[in-house]
């Protein structure tokens, strides 16, 4: 039995298992193969049974010694009551196999096989209890059992009423139960002593077993001491046979567990309940279980020889058994029994033997018959034959029905975890009652008078802990785990068990995943999934004997209102599925796991607070702590910026912070409360504080997403205060915790930045920041016991100064980055590292823009002084430094797009510097300065770097287009300034013209007029303006230049080309009629200038004709102006129509009037010159129909124009209408003349 194979995992069923019967081992199999079980048919009734030995402490099986006939069993063998390896560790106490179980035997097994409790197994109990339950319909004996529910598992233990009431007489602990029992069940209870026959049978059985393992078959005299102990056993065993019941929640003294201590004949007292460390419970590292079993144990040992996972039909049971099993030779596994030949085997005995063999998977039974202690014969009986023995006939199918009904009854009614239920049947009664002892106990003065409370609480905790530690545990069980822990907490007194309470609260907080949004789950758990399966376990009793005396029955069972449920007749248990349909399984109290972020975090914090209270209450040095009232709000200190020193003061605070972080790496430790490092209080408080910091971080992140920035800052402040306390307590900072801190500071930086950008709602943010819940105050009070919590005050103050907020945000990101440098966190968390550097680059851009805008504001306020102030220069330096650092941040993570944006902003800063250096004196004397040129060229360099950073437009088209536009603007601005304020004192005119031309052409290069975008009209306007300026420049050069005819011709061609391009581009725009008109008038002037150098009338007429064509093409511009004036004229409902027409807000009225006057004069001049030339030509030539038509048309138009211009009262709109009309006639006349020629 001691082979390692016995503890192996259950294997697949073989053989006839698929056929659904019951199988036992054949003669050639050993017990180790029992895990393979299959099926056997018993008397025509199919009953499936499967037994897997999960643990065995028995020695290797040996054959029993077959005693010679006439051996006198009344004589003690030489080895009697001495420890024997063949009988295992229970050798000296076995007294046969009728040893009583201990009050908490199921708990010992549950602790050892914690994986099975709550889910896989229906019942955990001693085999004797199982047998006693299954014999209820057949037996008149009393039944008294304690029932506890853990998940879907029931724990059954014998509740020895006689033992309890004897204790009550001595200590008064169970007075309430004794009074209840006497009132409702037996009014005249008195202790019943066991008969001499009972002790005779136990002694003769014990001697028989020792003879069987001795092997010599001889009776040998024993010492007088042994005889005395045998004779005294009848008096002593009554008190010592079972375990002593402990006073509720007493810490026990140490009790010897050495088996040799009881070798004098009496059974040993079990040690008071000290739950040892359970080696078989899984201990995984993913959940820190800070509860030390040994410190709060109540000695619940699993001391069964073997623990068996027994499946009886659909009922799964974990059963403890001490039955000796013999083997060897022809019989590899047999059980050994002693029977009086004069007493036939009855049904109770048969069921007893059959169940023992089924549970232990023993195929055969060897029966030794005796008469008056004299051995007569041996008989071999197969297990499957036991139900058909003479005088012992019973139906295995009925036994199966009984088992299923009892389990269904118990599961339907024992619904409250943590409650102790009492299943009771009086001797000779047919009524079975179920009481809730916990409810009855609560009616007494001290509700902790239940000795089951502590073992149940520990088991609830252990099951929950075991479920939590399984990495593959589905989250649907979290509701079950929470229920287990809450029920555990209900059972415990806060003042007596702070460690368990703190640990359970910590585990409750661990149930809620804070790092990701919780998806909605149905809280389906083992507690909600009670099946009608049932397994019950009984301890072995001597059939037909009533060891505890007789119990009278109540006169009317229906009068018992205290009972939770009643089986009115034990005969009902034999009816198939009697209780499956009648007793509905009540839903468990499994709480759904919430999925709202704030609710989840608040629940976590409530558990953390309870845990912290438990820890704090257990620390004795209360008098050494500063007084604090949890109900008094702890002020969140708010310092004025002047006292804190602004952004400059942050440098010193950051240095102190980084020095502190460095010291943590060296393992420094400081606590104000005097906690001892390594103590459970220290370990637990560390974990609880860390959990609170995580919860506050998640709350802050959630508030941030809701744009509640004041609330977010309050939560991140609490998170950092928690972390600061953690740092004070921690002796060895884990990299994971440092990563948390880096994340907290990153979020804090985000919040400070958003507060800076949302200054208009500052009052609301300030109110949210200063609000505190009572829960937050109490947590903070606990934190203040260990630390001042001021380590991160520099990061969490709500400032009213924009610069300070931006600086604090930047310092938060810098601190987060510094933390990543302390260990290998940077390489281990590349995503977080990239995010931190992105934020550093972004905040430095924000600060750079802030200083740049301040510099621009100072510049705009500067009126007379031409020199740049020191304040401006200082702001430039700060801005440039921020941009430079930000660019480095983005380049280090290869973020080309953001690097390009910062390079673009640096270019803008250079342009502001250039603008600051322009002369502010007399505009007429101003020249483009070298400083302006220097800064504009620097700006161009930064824009070109930005383009090189992006590489191609495909990477980020919007940024690419923006940089191109800024670059084009810079070239255009520089060229315009050089053209308008030519530095003639330093450079020759030709050089200036060359530089202007080059800059304008480069501006055109980066001005994309073809791509369709929102910026396209601006690009078209910019390009048209550049062409106009270039044309004007070449026009001016042509006017001023003499000599070099080749150069003059070149300038003439360039001017005409650029005028033409400018006109085409302005023609595309709907909102630039004045610009188009100006370009066309300049083109006319250019034509007039050309005409002055012409000598022939033909050439002049050609030039005049081209000029008039240009005039005709201005009709589009006048139509745009006309349309706009008409639209504006129609808007006013009353008033002067002329005033309304002239008061155009979108048109520059003066500009239009000026251009209109010039246009009228030039048109008049061109028409007059045309008339003169055509008239002189007509005198020299005749029959020129075209010229006659043109001359006639021009005269008619000229006369109309003169009359129109003579009318000084005409409105702008009327004058525009005339021009449009005349231009239409001019265009028609030209077309008519062309047709006439054809």
From Swiss-Prot:
The keyword Repeat applies. Keywords: Activator, Nucleus, Repeat, TPR repeat, Transcription, Transcription regulation. InterPro entries: EDRF1_N, EDRF1_TPR. Residues 9-38, 223-241, 253-263 have a biased composition (Low complexity). One of its GO terms (cellular component) is nucleus. GO terms for biological process: positive regulation of DNA-templated transcription. Residues 530-547 have a biased composition (Acidic residues). Transcription factor involved in erythroid differentiation. Involved in transcriptional activation of the globin gene. The gene is EDRF1. This is Erythroid differentiation-related factor 1. TPR repeats lie at residues 693-726, 914-953. It is found in: Nucleus. Residues 1-38, 220-268, 517-561, 620-647 are annotated as: Disordered. It holds the Pfam family TPR_EDRF1. The keyword Transcription regulation applies.
């Amino acid at each position: 039995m001691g082979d390692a194979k016995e503890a192996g995992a259950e294997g697949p069923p073989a053989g006839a298992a698929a056929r659904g019967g019951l199988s036992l081992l054949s003669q050639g199999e050993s017990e180790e193969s029992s895990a393979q079980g299959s099926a056997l048919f018993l008397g025509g009734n199919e009953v499936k049974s499967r037994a897997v030995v999960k643990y065995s402490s028995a020695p290797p099986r040996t054959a029993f010694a077959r005693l010679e006939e006439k051996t006198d069993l009344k004589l003690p063998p030489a080895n009697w009551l001495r420890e024997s390896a063949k009988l295992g560790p229970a050798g000296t106490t076995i007294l046969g196999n009728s040893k009583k179980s201990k009050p908490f035997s199921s708990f010992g097994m549950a602790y050892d096989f914690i994986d099975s409790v709550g889910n896989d197994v229906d019942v955990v109990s001693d085999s004797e209890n199982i047998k006693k339950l299954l014999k209820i319909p057949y037996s008149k004996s009393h039944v008294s059992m304690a029932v506890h529910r853990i998940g879907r598992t029931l724990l059954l233990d014998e509740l020895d009423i006689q033992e309890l009431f004897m204790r009550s007489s001595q200590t008064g602990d169970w007075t309430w139960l004794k009074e209840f029992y006497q009132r409702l069940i037996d009014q005249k209870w008195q202790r019943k002593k066991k008969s001499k026959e009972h002790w005779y049978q136990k002694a003769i059985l014990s001697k028989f077993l020792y003879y069987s393992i001795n092997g010599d078959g001889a009776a040998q005299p024993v010492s007088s001491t042994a005889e005395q102990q045998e004779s005294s056993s009848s008096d002593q065993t009554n008190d010592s046979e079972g375990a002593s019941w402990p006073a509720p929640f007493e810490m026990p003294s140490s009790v010897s567990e050495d088996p040799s201590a009881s070798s004098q004949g009496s059974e040993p007292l079990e040690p008071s309940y000290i739950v040892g460390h359970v080696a078989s419970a899984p201990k995984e590292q993913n959940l820190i279980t800070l509860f030390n079993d040994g410190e709060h144990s109540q000695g619940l040992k699993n001391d069964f020889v073997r623990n068996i996972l027994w499946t009886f039909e659909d009922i799964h049971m974990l059963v403890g058994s001490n039955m000796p099993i013999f083997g060897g030779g022809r019989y590899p596994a047999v059980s050994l029994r002693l029977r009086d030949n004069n007493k036939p085997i009855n049904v109770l005995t048969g069921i007893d033997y059959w169940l023992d063999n089924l549970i232990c998977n023993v195929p055969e039974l060897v029966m030794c018959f005796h008469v008056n202690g004299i051995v007569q014969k041996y008989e071999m009986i197969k297990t499957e034959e036991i139900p058909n023995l003479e005088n012992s006939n019973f139906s295995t199918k009925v036994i199966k029905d009984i088992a299923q009904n009892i389990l269904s009854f118990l599961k339907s009614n024992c619904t409250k975890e943590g409650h102790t239920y009492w299943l009771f049947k009086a001797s000779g009664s047919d009524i079975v009652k179920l009481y809730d002892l916990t409810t009855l106990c609560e009616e007494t003065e001290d509700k902790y008078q239940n000795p089951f409370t502590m073992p149940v609480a520990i088991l609830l905790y252990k099951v929950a802990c075991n479920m939590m530690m399984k990495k593959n545990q589905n989250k649907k069980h979290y509701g079950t785990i929470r229920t287990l822990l809450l029920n555990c907490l209900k059972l415990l007194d806060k003042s007596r068990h702070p460690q368990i309470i703190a640990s359970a609260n910590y585990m409750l907080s661990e149930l809620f995943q804070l790092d990701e949004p919780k998806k909605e789950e149905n809280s389906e758990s083992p507690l909600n999934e009670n099946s009608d399966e049932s397994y019950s376990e009984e301890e072995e009793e001597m059939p037909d004997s009533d060891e505890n005396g007789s119990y009278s029955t109540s006169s009317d069972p229906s009068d018992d209102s205290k009972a939770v449920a009643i089986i009115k007749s034990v005969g009902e248990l034999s009816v198939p599925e009697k209780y499956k349909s009648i007793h509905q399984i009540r839903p468990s109290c499994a709480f759904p796991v919430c999925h709202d972020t704030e609710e989840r975090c608040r629940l976590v914090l409530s558990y953390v607070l309870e845990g912290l209270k438990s820890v704090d209450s257990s620390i004795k040095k209360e008098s050494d702590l500063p007084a604090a009232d949890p109900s008094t709000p702890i002020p969140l200190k708010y310092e004025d910026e002047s006292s804190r020193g602004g952004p400059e003061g942050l440098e010193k605070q950051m240095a102190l912070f980084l020095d502190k972080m460095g010291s943590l790496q060296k393992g420094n430790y400081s606590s104000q409360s005097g906690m001892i490092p390594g103590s459970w209080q220290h370990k637990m408080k560390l974990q609880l504080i860390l959990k609170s910091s995580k919860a506050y971080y998640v709350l802050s992140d959630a508030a941030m997403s809701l744009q509640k920035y004041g609330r977010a800052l309050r939560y991140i402040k609490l998170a950092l205060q928690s972390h600061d306390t953690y740092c004070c307590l921690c002796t060895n900072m884990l990299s994971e915790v440092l990563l948390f801190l880096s994340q907290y500071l990153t979020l804090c930086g985000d919040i400070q930045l958003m507060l800076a950008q949302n200054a208009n709602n500052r009052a609301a943010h300030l109110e949210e920041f200063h609000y505190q819940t009572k829960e937050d105050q109490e947590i903070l009070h606990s934190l203040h016991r260990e630390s001042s919590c001021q380590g991160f005050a520099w990061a969490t103050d709500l400032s009213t100064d924009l610069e300070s907020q931006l600086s604090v945000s930047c310092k938060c990101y810098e601190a987060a980055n510094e933390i990543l440098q302390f260990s290998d966190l940077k390489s281990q968390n590349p995503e977080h590292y990239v995010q931190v550097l992105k934020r550093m680059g972004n905040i430095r851009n924000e600060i750079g823009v802030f200083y740049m805008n301040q510099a621009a504001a100072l510049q705009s306020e500067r009126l007379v002084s031409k020199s740049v102030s020191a304040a401006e220069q200082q702001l430039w330096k700060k801005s440039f430094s921020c941009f430079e650092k930000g660019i480095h941040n983005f380049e280090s993570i290869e973020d080309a797009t953001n690097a390009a944006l910062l390079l673009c902003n640096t270019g803008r800063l250079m342009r502001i510097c250039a603008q600051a250096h322009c002369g502010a004196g007399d505009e007429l004397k101003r020249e483009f300065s070298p400083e302006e040129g220097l800064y504009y060229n620097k700006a161009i360099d930064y824009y070109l770097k930005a383009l090189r950073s992006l590489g191609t437009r495909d990477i980020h088209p919007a940024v690419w287009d923006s940089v191109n536009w800024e670059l084009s603007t810079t070239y255009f601005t520089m060229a315009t300034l050089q053209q308008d304020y030519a530095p003639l004192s330093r450079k020759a005119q030709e050089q200036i013209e060359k530089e202007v031309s080059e800059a304008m052409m480069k501006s055109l290069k980066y001005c994309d007029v073809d791509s369709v975008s929102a910026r396209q009209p601006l690009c078209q306007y910019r390009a048209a303006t550049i062409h106009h300026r270039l044309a004007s420049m070449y026009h001016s050069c042509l006017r001023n230049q003499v000599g070099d005819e080749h150069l003059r011709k070149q300038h003439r061609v360039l001017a005409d080309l650029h005028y033409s391009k400018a006109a085409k581009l302005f023609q595309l725009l709907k909102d630039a009629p004045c610009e188009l008109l100006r370009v066309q008038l300049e083109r006319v002037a250019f034509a007039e200038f050309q005409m002055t150098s012409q000598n022939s009338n033909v050439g002049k007429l050609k030039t005049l004709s081209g000029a008039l064509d240009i005039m005709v093409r201005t009709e589009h511009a006048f139509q745009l102006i006309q349309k706009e004036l008409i639209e504006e004229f129609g808007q006013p409902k009353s008033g002067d129509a002329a005033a309304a027409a002239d008061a155009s807000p979108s048109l520059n009225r003066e500009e239009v009037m000026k251009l209109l006057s010039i246009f009228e004069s030039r048109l008049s001049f061109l028409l007059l010159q045309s008339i003169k030339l055509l008239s002189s030509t007509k005198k020299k030539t005749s029959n020129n129909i075209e010229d006659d038509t043109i001359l006639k048309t021009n005269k008619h138009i000229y006369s109309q124009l003169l009359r129109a211009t003579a009318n000084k009262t005409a409105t702008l709109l009327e004058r525009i209408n005339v021009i449009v009309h005349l231009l239409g006639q001019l265009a028609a006349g030209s077309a008519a003349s062309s047709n006439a020629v054809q």
